[in-house]
């Protein structure tokens, strides 16, 4: 995180005889972070298992994977396992709006209907924390999910969407 701040405190003391004395106390904090990291705040990264050979997919393909319209990765062939955050999280709301193009009720109805008709055995897996999402994806070869871009670690791979990664101009998966 980028933190640049300067705190200046001016102290003026007036004594009983009317003479004045002044003092200045300065506290300077400078910390730098990569500009790309700072620009990722508020963006979501689509993450996959490191063994997945894919590096880039279109938004339409991403939607097909998330909607369980494609059950296996191409190329690679691993079974797709979508991981979602729990209802009410801003990350989940953003994904429902931007990728699924539905609200929570529509999402629930969609997957219940797929299960009822036998098209799908189970829907997206739910995880209650970012570390849990990352851990699941790092262990399951076909897993795909999302986390805040500034919380990604080296145990997973960030998937480019439409040729763009978080922090690049035009990247559209944001909170």
What are these regions (language model features)?
Residues 6-15:
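Bacterial N-terminal signal peptides
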């Amino acid at each position: 995180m980028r933190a640049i701040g300067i705190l200046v405190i001016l102290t003026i003391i007036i004594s009983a005889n009317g003479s004045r004395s002044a003092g200045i106390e300065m506290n300077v904090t400078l910390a730098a972070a990569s500009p790309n990291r700072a620009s990722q705040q508020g963006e979501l990264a689509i993450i996959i298992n490191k063994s997945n050979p894919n590096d880039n997919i279109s938004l339409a393909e991403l939607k097909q994977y998330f909607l369980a319209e494609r059950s296996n990765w191409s190329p690679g062939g691993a079974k797709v396992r979508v991981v979602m955050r729990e209802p009410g999280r801003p990350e989940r709301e953003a994904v429902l709006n931007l990728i699924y193009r539905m609200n929570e009720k529509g999402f629930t109805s969609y997957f219940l209907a797929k299960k009822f008709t036998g098209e799908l055995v189970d829907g997206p897996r739910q995880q209650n924390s970012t570390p849990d999402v990352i851990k699941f994806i790092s262990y399951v070869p076909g897993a795909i999910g999302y986390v805040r871009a500034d919380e990604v670690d080296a145990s997973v791979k960030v998937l480019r969407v439409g040729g763009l990664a978080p922090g690049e101009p035009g990247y559209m998966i944001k909170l």
